[in-house]
Regions:
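Short, Lys/Arg-enriched N-terminal segment that forms or immediately precedes the first helix
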Residues: 1-15
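N-terminal helix-turn-helix DNA-binding core of bacterial DNA-binding proteins
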Residues: 14-56, 69
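Amphipathic alpha-helical dimerization/coiled-coil segments
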Residues: 3, 89-114
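Basic amphipathic alpha-helical segments that dock to polyanions
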Residues: 57-59, 63-64
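Basic, amphipathic "hinge/linker" alpha-helix immediately C-terminal to the N-terminal HTH DNA-binding motif
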Residues: 76-95
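Beta-hairpin "wing" of winged helix-turn-helix
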Residues: 65-76, 82
Length: 114
């Protein structure tokens, strides 16, 4: 089993609280396509190694919507979330920030990301 799959299977390490990255990950996922809540939860679980609690995910989505970064609409019995133009701009700013703040670390440990 690769280093990546071992880490993903266990979730985030105890030393690192990954909750602060939730909004960033949601924006990034919605930049790929519009999604409903359970679909977002599944995609987050693939990347973080654990499915987010609905009590964490849906308040984060509501906050992103309140800030104008995400828009929701009802389709049949599901709520679909879509990235707004403001959300696209916010994601670009966040990517710039993360690259500047963490890029050197990722380059140094790139073998863990492969």
């Amino acid at each position: 089993m690769s280093k990546r799959s071992v880490a993903a299977a266990r979730g985030p390490p105890e030393c690192c609280d990954m909750r602060g990255l939730l909004s960033f990950l949601i924006l990034w996922l919605l930049s790929k396509k519009d999604m409903y809540g359970q679909e977002i939860a599944k995609e987050l679980a693939k990347r973080k190694g654990e499915k987010p609690n609905p009590g964490t995910l849906y308040p984060a989505l509501r906050d992103l919507e309140r800030r104008g970064l995400v828009r929701s609409s009802r389709h049949e019995r599901k709520t679909i979330y879509k990235l707004t133009e403001e959300g696209k701009k916010g994601l670009k700013k966040a990517c710039y920030y993360f690259c500047r703040a963490y890029g050197e670390i990722f380059r140094e440990y790139r073998d863990f990301c492969a």
